[in-house]
Amino acid sequence: MHSKPETIANVSVKEYSFSKKQIQGVVKASQFRWTFIWSFHKGLLTVNPPLGRALIEDALLRFLLKKDYELEAGNEYKFTISAKF
């Protein structure tokens, strides 16, 4: 039986600002690295650079929607993506 492909994404929260209503951070998966801004009051996620963004954007958004109230600046988090890249 084959195991499902997966990749571990590592999220580092750099800033969590209630006044700006946003979270800024870095997410790394495989050889890729992106910065992100999650404007939680607008439901808007910005991920840069665009290279490989399609690989991470939906999974990162699901993670942030599920965990945003638990996240703290300066902490590291992990989540699993059901794809290998």
Where are these regions (language model features)?
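Intrinsically disordered, low-complexity regulatory segments enriched in Ser/Thr/Pro
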Residues: 33-51
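Generic recognition of long tandem-repeat/solenoid scaffolds
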Residues: 23-29, 45-47, 83
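Amphipathic, interaction-prone secondary-structure segments
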Residues: 8-38
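Short intrinsically disordered terminal tails
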Residues: 1-6, 82-85
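Generic structural motif
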Residues: 9-15, 45-47, 71
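Mixed-charge, Lys/Arg-enriched low-complexity segments
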Residues: 48-85
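Non-membrane alpha-helical secondary structure
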Residues: 5, 15, 19-21, 48, ...
